[in-house]
């Protein structure tokens, strides 16, 4: 028996063949009249999203999913997720990054900061906590011999990025002392980007790319982390035409083919001019980019603790239902490749998930293991929250990161 449980609104579906308005309307609404009802509705949301996306949802899914619950709350900061996913990331760097990422709470693009002066996707913890966590991170970055495994140009680049990280953290601490919310958030992003670059340099010099099946060897592959800037044309909440930037980070360590294919299309200008096809409270999806020679991109999901990803199948179909992906749908602005429900290995567009990460508890997000996550929005979440169907991507370009095409 299959179930379809609804949340407070209709959910959009991804890609051709993933569903219809009639099917979406079949999801029953849950009236939020009490905290208990709201909590049940939030748990149900994970099931409903998957149901309307055309995924099979067995009746025992909640019992199975309880086996997947982690021992700690899931990480919802996109940059922290990416840093933790870097192979061979040094402990001092990971710990510094987690200290920095912990000062904000991640939301859905419309949080007002504690000072009230900025619209943001992040909320701030207490000022004393921010100062303490930033000081702890600076202490981790101030140790001796941290980059001893590197030499030559790699060493020079890593040392420069280490100074960039420390500069951003000092500015972050000073901003907290002055209670400047926007400056804390902007310097957090800058500092974590610098730390991610250092981790990527170390990893790319100490590890090899993850193996991929021979049948996919000719597809573009990315090794490392690449930053992509989307310039989008849209209207503000007041209706004024404007343009804004959304910064993405692609993870070629964990999803070499998916991220590589996305980055290759960006490099070739295939996303320039694409329209936003679907937008609602849950997701934003683009049109499918036109290619001279379309290639099928297999679904690609790396499971925690494994050296190579699963290809061509969902985790449930692979018998890995209880395993957790390295790149989960935990963060606002998770970027994934779309595909029809009846073909996990077809060429598709991409979509962003816009749900508040606190709305779906860990272990109950049924998008995990059914779609290939490519990366995350690391800046510009408020622009993402303003996008509507009919808006467009003016341009997409690679703007930074540490990566190679292989």
Which role does the model predict for each range below?
Residues 10-13, 17, 52-54, 61, ...:
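Acidic/proline-rich low-complexity IDRs
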Residues 36-63:
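Single-pass hydrophobic alpha-helical transmembrane segments typical
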Residues 60-406:
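Cyclophilin-like peptidyl-prolyl cis-trans isomerases
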């Amino acid at each position: 028996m299959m179930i379809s449980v609804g949340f407070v609104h209709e959910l959009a579906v991804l890609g051709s063949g993933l569903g219809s308005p009639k099917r979406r309307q079949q999801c029953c609404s849950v009236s939020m009249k009490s905290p208990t009802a709201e909590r049940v509705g939030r748990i149900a949301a994970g099931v409903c999203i998957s149901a309307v996306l055309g995924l099979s949802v067995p009746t025992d899914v909640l019992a199975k999913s309880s086996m997947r619950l982690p021992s700690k709350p899931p990480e919802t900061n996109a940059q922290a997720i990416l840093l933790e996913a870097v192979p061979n990331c040094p402990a001092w760097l990971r710990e510094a990054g987690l200290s920095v990422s912990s000062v904000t709470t991640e939301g859905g693009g419309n949080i007002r900061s504690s000072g009230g002066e900025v619209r943001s996707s992040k909320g701030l913890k207490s000022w004393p906590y921010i100062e303490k966590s930033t000081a702890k991170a600076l202490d981790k970055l101030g140790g001796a011999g941290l980059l001893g495994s590197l030499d030559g140009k790699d060493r020079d680049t890593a040392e420069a990025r280490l100074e960039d990280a420390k500069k951003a953290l000092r500015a972050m601490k000073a901003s907290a002392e002055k209670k400047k919310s926007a400056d804390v958030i902007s310097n957090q992003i800058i500092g974590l980007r610098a730390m991610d670059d250092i981790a990527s340099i170390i990893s790319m010099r100490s590890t090899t790319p993850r193996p991929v099946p021979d049948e996919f060897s000719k597809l573009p592959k990315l090794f490392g982390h690449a930053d992509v800037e989307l310039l989008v044309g849209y209207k503000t909440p007041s209706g004024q035409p404007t343009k804004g930037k959304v910064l993405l980070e692609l993870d070629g360590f964990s999803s070499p083919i998916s991220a590589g294919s996305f980055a290759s299309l960006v490099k070739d200008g295939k996303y320039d001019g694409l329209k936003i096809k679907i937008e609602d409270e849950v997701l934003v999806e683009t049109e499918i980019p036109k290619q001279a020679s379309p290639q099928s991109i297999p679904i690609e999901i790396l499971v925690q603790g494994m050296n190579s990803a699963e290809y061509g199948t969902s985790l449930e179909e692979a018998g890995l239902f209880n395993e957790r992906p390295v790149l989960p749908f935990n963060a606002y602005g998770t970027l994934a490749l779309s595909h029809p429900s009846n073909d996990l290995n077809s060429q598709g567009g991409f979509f962003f998930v816009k749900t508040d990460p606190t709305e779906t508890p860990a272990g109950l997000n049924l998008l995990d293991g059914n779609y290939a996550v490519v990366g995350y929005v690391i800046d510009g979440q408020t622009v993402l929250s303003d996008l509507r169907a009919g808006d467009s991507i003016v341009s997409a370009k690679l703007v930074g990161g540490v990566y190679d095409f292989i």
